[in-house]
Design a protein with these regions (language model features):
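Conserved, compact domain cores that house catalytic/ligand-binding motifs in diverse enzymes
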Residues: 138-217
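Extended active-site neighborhood of metal-dependent phosphoesterases/phosphodiesterases
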Residues: 91-94, 98, 112-130, 189-287, ...
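Bacterial N-terminal signal peptides that target proteins for export
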Residues: 1-6
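Bacterial N-terminal signal peptides
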Residues: 7-15
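Acidic, histidine-bearing metal-coordination/catalytic regions of metal-dependent phosphoesterases
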Residues: 20-143, 148, 169, 389, ...
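Acidic/histidine-rich helix-loop elements
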Residues: 59-95, 141-161, 227, 231, ...
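Active-site neighborhood of phospho(di)ester-bond hydrolases with catalytic His/Asp-centered motifs
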Residues: 143-145, 175-181, 185, 206-212, ...
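Active-site-proximal segments of metal-dependent phosphoesterases and phosphodiesterases across multiple
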Residues: 151, 263-269, 287-328
Length: 430
C-alpha cells in the first residue's frame, strides 16, 4: 500500500513538473542599428526561457541558434492595478511576470529571420515570429496609432489590425511604426497581453512611442514609464532618466528619434530632450554612414486638428529647423493633419524644412470631428477625419530620392499623399 501511495505521489510530482511554462507579450523591437540587430521582448511566468532563431526558410530548428535572455527580472509594475476584465467587471490584476529581453546581434542586413521562445530544454513555448532586418535601399512601413486596445470592447483592436492588413494589401511593408495609445490603460497587463496575441505582432518588427494612455492606469494618479519599459525592449540609448522610452534607431537611410511626450511636459525635460537630440543627430551626421533622413516621432500632436492651433509645433519647430529634421510624426489628436515642408514658419518648396504630420485614430470608436480652421491656415495643407468612427493609417515608402507618405481610409482608398524630398546636407553640426 505504501509503495502504491509513493508511486502516486511521485507521478503527481512528475505531472506538475511537466506542466509547460507560460509566456506572453512577445514582440520584436529594433536594435540601435536594425540592419544588424533586433531586440526581443517577452514575459514568462517562471525563469528558464530563451530564444531560438534561424534564417527564415531554413529547414527545421535543429541548427537554430539558442540564446538566453540578457535580462530576466521579476516585474511588479502591474501588481494590484485596478482594471476591468473582458466582461467589463472591475478587477485588481496581480500577474506573475518575469520580464525578459534579448538583443540579437551580428545579423545579416536585408534578411528575414524566424524565432521561437523556448524553455530550458529548447521546447517551443510560442508560435513562430519573424522580422526583416534593414539594409534594402528601398523599403516600406505601416504607420498607425491611437487604437486604445480595451478588452471589454474587442472591436477596437480588430479595427486597427484590419487596417494594418489594408495597408499591407495597398503596399506590402516590412515593419510597423506606431505613434502611441495602443492600449486604453497601460497599467492593465491584460490589455497588453490580449493585444500581443494578434498575428500582426508575429509577422513584423514594431517600433513606437509611448502615448498618454500607454502611460496611465485606470485610476487617477497611476502612471509610469515602467508600463512601456516592461512591455517592450527598445534600445537603451535615450537620456539617462528616460532610457528605453526615449530612444533612437537606424532603419536603412533613416535615423528615427523617438520622444516621450509624457516626460517632455516641463521646460527642464524638454531642454534635456533637445540636448540629447542634438547630440544624437550630430554624431550620426558626423559618422562614416550619415543618415539621409531624420524622422522625429512623438505622441502629442503638433497642431490641434480641430482648430489648427499650434501645440507642440511651437515647442519644437526651431530645434527641427536647426537640426534639419525632414519629417515630424505624431498622433493623439485623432484627426489627420499635415503640412508641406516648413522652415522658419513658412512653407517651402521642399528643398529645406520639416513636414509635420499627425495620424488619425484607428479604433472606429474615438475619432473626432473638425471645425473651421482658425490658425495656421498657411501651414496646414490637409485635414481628415470620419468623425467618431474613424479608421485610418499610412503607408510610408522610402528610397534615396524621397519619402512618400500615403493616407488610406478603411477601404484602402487614398485620401492624401505627401512627398518628403531628400536634402543635401551642406554643413555638419558642430
Amino acid at each position: 500500500m505504501r509503495i502504491r501511495f509513493l508511486f502516486i505521489v511521485l507521478s503527481l510530482a512528475s505531472s506538475l513538473l511537466a506542466v509547460a511554462q507560460s509566456i506572453c507579450n512577445v514582440v520584436t523591437n529594433p536594435a540601435a542599428d536594425a540592419s544588424t540587430g533586433m531586440r526581443i521582448s517577452w514575459a514568462a511566468d517562471s525563469a528558464g526561457t530563451g530564444v531560438m532563431y534561424k534564417l527564415a526558410g531554413a529547414r527545421g530548428w535543429d541548427r537554430a541558434v539558442y540564446l538566453q535572455p540578457e535580462t530576466a527580472t521579476r516585474c511588479t509594475a502591474f501588481d494590484s492595478i485596478f482594471s476591468r476584465n473582458a466582461r467589463g467587471e472591475d478587477v485588481y490584476e496581480i500577474p506573475t511576470i518575469i520580464k525578459c529581453g534579448l538583443t540579437l546581434s551580428h545579423l545579416r542586413p536585408n534578411t528575414r529571420y524566424e524565432y521561437l521562445i523556448v524553455d530550458s530544454h529548447r521546447r517551443p513555448l510560442s508560435q513562430t515570429y519573424s522580422f526583416l532586418t534593414a539594409g534594402a535601399s528601398e523599403w516600406n512601413c505601416c504607420i498607425i496609432s491611437d487604437f486604445h486596445s480595451y478588452t471589454p470592447t474587442p472591436k477596437r483592436l480588430t479595427s486597427a489590425m484590419t487596417m494594418i492588413d489594408t495597408v499591407q494589401a495597398y503596399c506590402p511593408f516590412d515593419w510597423v511604426l506606431h505613434l502611441g495609445d495602443v492600449v486604453a490603460w497601460g497599467g492593465s497587463w491584460s490589455f497588453w497581453q490580449r493585444m500581443y496575441q494578434e498575428r500582426q505582432f508575429r509577422e513584423y518588427m514594431w517600433a513606437g512611442v509611448q502615448g498618454n494612455h500607454d502611460y496611465m492606469g485606470r485610476e487617477k494618479g497611476v502612471g509610469t514609464n515602467d508600463f512601456t519599459r516592461n512591455t517592450t525592449y527598445y534600445p537603451a540609448n535615450g537620456f539617462p532618466e528616460d532610457e528605453r522610452v526615449t530612444y533612437h534607431f537606424r532603419y536603412g537611410d533613416v535615423l528615427f528619434i523617438m520622444l516621450n511626450s509624457m516626460t517632455n511636459r516641463t521646460a527642464e525635460n524638454i531642454t534635456k530632450a533637445k540636448a540629447w537630440m542634438r547630440q544624437v543627430v550630430g554624431e550620426a551626421r558626423a559618422s562614416q554612414n550619415p543618415p539621409r533622413y531624420v524622422v522625429v516621432c512623438q505622441h502629442f500632436e503638433w497642431f490641434n486638428g480641430r482648430t489648427g492651433q499650434s501645440n507642440d509645433y511651437k515647442r519644437w519647430s526651431k530645434t527641427f529647423d536647426e537640426l534639419g529634421v525632414d519629417l515630424a510624426l505624431a498622433g493623439n489628436n485623432h484627426i489627420y493633419v499635415r503640412t508641406d515642408a516648413v522652415y522658419q514658419g513658412v512653407t517651402t518648396n521642399g528643398s529645406t524644412g520639416t513636414v509635420y504630420l499627425q495620424t488619425p485614430s484607428s479604433d472606429n470608436a474615438r475619432g473626432r470631428t473638425i471645425s473651421t480652421l482658425q490658425s495656421n491656415q498657411k501651414l496646414i495643407k490637409r485635414r481628415w477625419t470620419e468623425g467618431k468612427n474613424t479608421i485610418g493609417a499610412l503607408s510610408m515608402k522610402v528610397n534615396p530620392q524621397r519619402i512618400l507618405l500615403t493616407l488610406l481610409n478603411r477601404y484602402g482608398e487614398v485620401v492624401d499623399t505627401v512627398s518628403v524630398k531628400a536634402k543635401e546636407q551642406t554643413k555638419r553640426l558642430e
